[in-house]
Amino acid sequence: MSRAISLHSVSKTYGRSSRAVDRFSLSVAPGEFVVLLGPSGCGKSTVLRMIAGLEEVSEGELLLDGEPSNDLSPRERGMAMVFQNFALYPNMTNRANIGFPLKLENPRRDHTDRVESTARMLGIESVLDRYPRQLSGGERQRVAMGRAISRRPSAFLMDEPLSNLDAKLRNHLRAEIAQLTAELGVTTVYVTHDQAEAMSLGDRVAVMRGGVLQQVSTPREVYALPENVFVAAFIGTPRINLLQAVVHAPLEGRMSIDLGRQRLPLPEPLSADHQLLRIQQGRPIIVGLRSEAVRIAPRSQARPGEVALSGIVEHVEYQGHEALVHLNTGSRPAVVPDLESARPQAPQRRRARSGGTGVLERLKQRATGSVAVLDHPAEESYAVRSPDRPAVTASDLVVRTGPDMRLRTGGQVPLLVDLAHLYVFDHSGRRICPLPRDIPGLDV
């Protein structure tokens, strides 16, 4: 029987001040597939281990089928874990590995039928009498999954099970896992740092940063309606373009967004979203544009809701079926600290312990603070100059285009921006618009 899992304000603390998970709340319905997604070190595996009973809950409450379960042993929880390193016994055959948990439960019973039916389900019946060392990585992972399935657990807990496999095998096993869990109808919590896995597998995706839950939504909603800059930047390939900007909302005249050297005029009459931007007049904001929201085309080809910009081609990445064009529009990128480094700065001396902020405190501030940084570089930061070579500009916008478009590095190209796909975040990184109702086909 599938199990309902609920975590209410769960925290995990190591020592006195190291907080790996901070007030994490999540409910997983019976039979649901939920993915915990985030960068390395964000606390997603710690959450999984607390659900399994391998880590104690420091604060908060874990409920299994509505019953308090903080003090239950791992065996009493009736769950099965699948790890990235397979965790198979090398001195046992694959048959013995799959049947090992069954033998522990009932040593006298013959478990051959269940082991073989599990192997048939996974397509590994022909390798049951071999040893793990004789298998490929994909076959070993199937054996590890078979060992978990044979117990008929109330929930699967999968900790990056595909991370040690090559890309082709990952894609194949990803499809198998999706099909298998759907057939079994077992509650599944899956940990990964790979957004492709999360978006293709999960009924819902829970995005984490610094031990804090950022957003829990369907894959479509996480992509279309990110709660903040971190979620927007972490979901999507290529990464969303994030630019520093300021709203100009004169009493008379057209409202616009100032990107530095160019402006985005907002079409009239203003939409409900754009009306809300009036209260941001003069304040720093972050504009988000995914690569599909911008196209290379002259102003004469503008569709309703599109406005014109221009950019200088800095670099073109040929991808086969498409090309990614890196452009400089004279804008200032916004930095998401967890995903990229800010501009290099001169090294600073270490502060004395008594007067400075400790490493743990700085990590805590980063985990609970704003998710974006609005730096204010000097005007010359648009170009890096050297005495013996010309200025080199940095790209601030990535646009998708067809593979056959001929573009010259250093050439200026006309751009059209679809304002229906414009994201605006406040200075701390929280989304201001769009509102949920403005996303076509999205039911919230």
Residue locations for each model-derived region?
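Conserved post-Walker A/P-loop segment of ABC ATPase nucleotide-binding domains
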Residues: 55-63
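Helix-to-loop junction immediately C-terminal to a conserved catalytic motif
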Residues: 52
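ABC ATPase nucleotide-binding domains
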Residues: 74-235
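ABC ATPase nucleotide-binding domain
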Residues: 6, 27, 63, 414-416
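ATP-binding/catalytic-site motifs of ATP-hydrolyzing domains
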Residues: 61, 67, 212
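Non-catalytic connector elements of ABC transporters
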Residues: 251-444
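The feature captures the beta-strand-to-loop junction immediately N-terminal to the Walker
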Residues: 37-39
